[in-house]
């Protein structure tokens, strides 16, 4: 049986979105992504508790921030043993509005990986797609530090990231879907509003088309999926990062997966170029209620999970 996952891999680079690296081997992803919430979830499992305890023990007396950085690198290093490609490691979301500290943290993370014998070409630094985060990426990219721009919900964010030369963006499909579904309430009709009409799917399709039309090299990696249909509707996207439970569903399915996105088709589009100077960026983002709310919410959630992780570490010291 040719699985839906195998078919998807013909068109798209499949990435595993997890801190639970023991699940990686069975799905054979090219890359992997992590975030503070996924690492927090992983260290609460018995299988990964020793990594947390060893990291705390090895760096006793150091600050909690120092220990968290080493914990992220410990997970990233283990993940890279199991995949041929890259791992994404996230800068603390509490730095989302501080360009210089984001730059400093990105440099520090890369130095830690290089000290562990891992080349910077195998690491993507995840930054929130705020104006400040995008400016940090612009500097880091010039230094050969590749960036993955996360918490991305709008075309203006995507356009600004591409102009800054970011290596990759992660537009969030599922969180966009969540927002619109909540707005429509009882009027939401999955059969009519989902699938190809899913607002999250349409957002990624529009961003992908914009990039290919204007010849940007920045990679598009759809993220934050709720259903396999959201994934298959984006077959052909440069990359898709998928949680283990949805990877399993694709692995178990024999559904036919057809290519939905292609560079050639996108190049024939007639989208207008987006203005991305700072004032235009801030106005357009502010004018998009969904993107504004979801960006703020995402930063709050990742920041809260970073605090929870700090408390776990403090409890072990």
Curated annotation (Swiss-Prot):
Pfam families: TAL_FSA. GO terms for cellular component: cytoplasm. It is an enzyme of class 2 (transferase). InterPro entries: Aldolase_TIM, TAL/FSA, Transaldolase_1, Transaldolase_AS. Pathway: Carbohydrate degradation; pentose phosphate pathway; D-glyceraldehyde 3-phosphate and beta-D-fructose 6-phosphate from D-ribose 5-phosphate and D-xylulose 5-phosphate (non-oxidative stage): step 2/3. Homodimer. This is Transaldolase. It comes from Burkholderia thailandensis (strain ATCC 700388 / DSM 13276 / CCUG 48851 / CIP 106301 / E264).
């Amino acid at each position: 049986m040719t699985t839906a996952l195998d078919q998807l891999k013909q068109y798209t680079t499949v990435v595993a979105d997890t801190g639970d690296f023991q699940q990686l081997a069975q799905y054979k992803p090219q890359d992997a992504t992590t975030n503070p919430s996924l690492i927090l979830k992983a260290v609460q499992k018995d299988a990964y508790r020793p990594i947390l305890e060893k990291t705390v023990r090895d760096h006793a007396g150091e600050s909690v921030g120092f220990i968290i950085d080493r914990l992220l690198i410990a997970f990233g290093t283990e993940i890279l043993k199991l995949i041929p490609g890259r791992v994404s490691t996230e800068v603390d979301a509490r730095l989302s509005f501080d360009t210089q500290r984001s730059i400093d943290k990105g440099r520090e993370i890369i130095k830690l990986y290089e000290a562990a014998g891992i080349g910077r070409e195998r690491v993507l630094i995840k930054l929130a797609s705020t104006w400040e985060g995008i400016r940090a990426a612009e500097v880091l990219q010039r230094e050969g530090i590749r960036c993955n721009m996360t918490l991305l919900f709008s075309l203006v964010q995507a356009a600004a990231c591409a102009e800054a030369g970011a290596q990759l963006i992660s537009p969030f499909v599922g969180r966009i879907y969540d927002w619109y579904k909540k707005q429509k309430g009882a009027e939401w009709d999955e059969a009519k509003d989902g699938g190809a009409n899913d607002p999250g799917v349409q957002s990624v399709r529009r961003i992908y088309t914009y990039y290919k039309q204007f010849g940007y090299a920045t990679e598009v990696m759809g993220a934050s999926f709720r259903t396999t249909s959201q994934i298959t509707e984006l077959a052909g996207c440069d990359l898709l990062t998928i949680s283990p439970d949805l990877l399993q569903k694709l692995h178990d399915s024999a559904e036919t997966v057809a290519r939905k996105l292609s560079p050639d088709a996108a190049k024939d589009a007639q989208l207008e170029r987006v203005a991305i100077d700072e004032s235009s960026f801030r106005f357009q983002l502010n004018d998009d209620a969904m993107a504004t709310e979801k960006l703020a919410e995402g930063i709050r959630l990742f920041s809260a999970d970073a605090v929870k992780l700090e408390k776990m570490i403090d409890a072990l010291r």
